[in-house]
Design a protein with these regions (language model features):
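Active-site rim beta-loop-alpha module in soluble metabolic enzymes
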Residues: 130-170
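Metabolite-binding pocket within alpha/beta catalytic cores that recognizes anionic/polar moieties
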Residues: 1-127
Length: 170
């Protein structure tokens, strides 16, 4: 059975809702990741704190490739990633959940691919639908059952941190 991966962003660091918790680390070709493994309702969950367990890794220093490679190595098929963000959409209020369906990546100094040349042929990733529609549908259904304010669809815009956007960028 596949594990479920959770990458927790700012404000999501407490995996205590899981049972049978144990902390581990894994060396990947891209560096080491720390993670917490546990179970939730009988499912194996692998939790990675995006900014590190002590919230000390700034956005531009996060080892995204190690996190993703490590989760795949650990048997994760689905990843739920949380983040605390602002919104330009007045319908998205604080505390609402937005299931993004598109993204704009305005970062400049982050590695964005596993491909670095060499013996492997060039690979181009199709990001027409960058987020899994089936997983988004499951999350939306569960969110509605739980009476959460949930929006299915939104564009995540990522700018280079660690800073907030300028008024012109917004």
């Amino acid at each position: 059975m596949s594990a479920i991966g959770v990458i927790g962003g700012t404000g999501v660091y407490d995996p205590s809702i899981f049972e049978n918790i144990h902390e581990e680390s894994l060396m990947t070709p891209y560096g080491e990741i720390d993670y917490v493994q546990g179970t939730y309702k009988g499912k194996t969950v692998i939790f990675v704190a995006r900014h590190g367990k002590d919230h000390t890794i700034p956005p531009h220093k996060i080892n995204y490739r190690a996190n993703i490679w490590g989760l795949k190595k650990l048997g994760v098929k689905f990843i739920i990633s949380t983040t605390a963000v602002g919104s330009l959409n007045k319908n998205f209020e604080p505390g609402h959940f937005v299931l993004t369906d598109q993204f704009l990546d305005f970062t400049k100094n982050r590695v964005t691919t596993f491909y670095e040349g060499g013996n492997r042929p060039v690979a181009h990733l199709d990001v027409t639908n960058p987020y899994c529609p089936e997983l988004r549908q499951i999350i939306e259904s569960v969110g509605k059952e739980q009476k959460l304010s949930i929006h299915n669809g939104g564009t995540y815009v990522c700018t280079e941190g660690p800073r907030f956007e300028t008024p012109a960028e917004i």
